[in-house]
Amino acid sequence: MAASTNRLRFLYSSARTVPQTGSITPISRRTYATTEPSPSATGAPATARKRTNFTDKLNAGPSFADFVSGGEDNTPLEPSEAYALKTAMVGPAGRKKEMTRLPSWLKTPIPDSKNYQRLKKDLRGLNLHTVCEEARCPNISDCWGGSDKSAATATIMLMGDTCTRGCRFCSVKTNRRPPPLDPHEPENTAEAISRWSLGYVVLTSVDRDDLADGGARHFAETVIKIKQKKPSMLVECLTGDYLGDLEMVKLVARSGLDVYAHNVETVEALTPFVRDRRATFQQSLRVLEAAKQARPDLITKTSLMLGFGETEEQLWDALRQLRSVGVDVVTFGQYMRPTKRHMPVHEYVTPDQFELWRQRALDMGFLYCASGPLVRSSYKAGEAFIENVLKKRRAAGTAGESVTDSKAAVDEATR
């Protein structure tokens, strides 16, 4: 035991007497990698190493002092710089071409929240479709990603996921002969909506020109089922033009809904190039006018996409015509190309321009206008305002027909 102790003492004393060489430095304290200059071994005052290239700057990174003091890297951008579009060369060697990158104000997070997954599961379980998914809406993570279902907004797409028309901006599937209607869809839709404890819901549909009534009776039946399950529910219907059959428009308008929406999509001059040839700007105006005539208290709504190459005068003309048929609400959003098969984007409109057109629409007498790069016709920002207007009207006793009266109107129209 004594021998072992003496041996340990010898090794310890030997280690302490190892001569220091130029390649070995005694460690007096624990060190960490920082962005601050470290003191030299000789004790001479340290100087910050000059950043010579991008790699040095990236490796060093900003210190806390850099953030506090601001500096040239934190100087706010001018609007012209912030809204400047950037380009990139893409493609294989020898065949590269210049493409405009998506502006920063159009980028949205990938949907992955628990509420998004739960909402999606409910829809799949009842064999329902949403325009949020079919049209690849950029707001899906925002509208579906609320902390609870009451904060979520989903636009239910009726009559299947296949359209009989082929608009050049739309990513929904097309076919001349889509599958037949699901007779259980109105009941399933009402059931799904009743589960979510929503106060406001949007119903839309594909165009079904293969049906004699364009699906108007199916639409009306869905509204009636929803109102029967929850009379307090506010319902917005975004419909097609029913090939100009105004009786079908009036049928849906009298079904008990609260907001009748039909989108003109673009200005009149560009309509033949943007929409299916069976749709015209004047026909859409007649649809909106017929809905208002069927129920004067009904809020009517439409939407336009910007970025197709429209001019200011064309937009002014579109707004004047919409006001002339009593449209109450208009929305503006940026056209975003779904695939290479669709129309290219002519222009990315800046947020400042969207705000300008919002003010112009309000000055013209529209009840409400939602305008922004990511705004879509059923975006929840507009619905919150419309919901408050409808509740005030209902409290004042001017909300329109009851569910019973609406059912009678539908029965009469469908004889």
Swiss-Prot record:
Classification via SUPFAM superfamilies: Radical SAM enzymes (SSF102114)
Binding site for [4Fe-4S] cluster 2: 163, 167, 170
Catalytic activity: [[Fe-S] cluster scaffold protein carrying a second [4Fe-4S](2+) cluster] + N(6)-octanoyl-L-lysyl-[protein] + 2 oxidized [2Fe-2S]-[ferredoxin] + 2 S-adenosyl-L-methionine + 4 H(+) = [[Fe-S] cluster scaffold protein] + N(6)-[(R)-dihydrolipoyl]-L-lysyl-[protein] + 4 Fe(3+) + 2 hydrogen sulfide + 2 5'-deoxyadenosine + 2 L-methionine + 2 reduced [2Fe-2S]-[ferredoxin]
Claim: Calcium is one of the keywords in the record: no
Ligand binding ([4Fe-4S] cluster 1): 132, 137, 143, 378
Subcellular location: Mitochondrion
Compositionally biased region (Low complexity): 33-47
EC number, UniProt record: 2.8.1.8
Co-factor binding details: Binds 2 [4Fe-4S] clusters per subunit. One cluster is coordinated with 3 cysteines and an exchangeable S-adenosyl-L-methionine.
One GO molecular-function entry: lipoate synthase activity
Biased composition (Polar residues): 20-32
GO CC term (a single one): mitochondrion
Pathway assignment: Protein modification; protein lipoylation via endogenous pathway; protein N(6)-(lipoyl)lysine from octanoyl-[acyl-carrier-protein]: step 2/2
Cofactor(s) named in the record: [4Fe-4S] cluster
HAMAP family, per database record: Lipoyl_synth
NCBIfam families: lipA, PRK05481.1, PRK12928.1
Family listed: Belongs to the radical SAM superfamily. Lipoyl synthase family.
Record-given protein name: Lipoyl synthase, mitochondrial
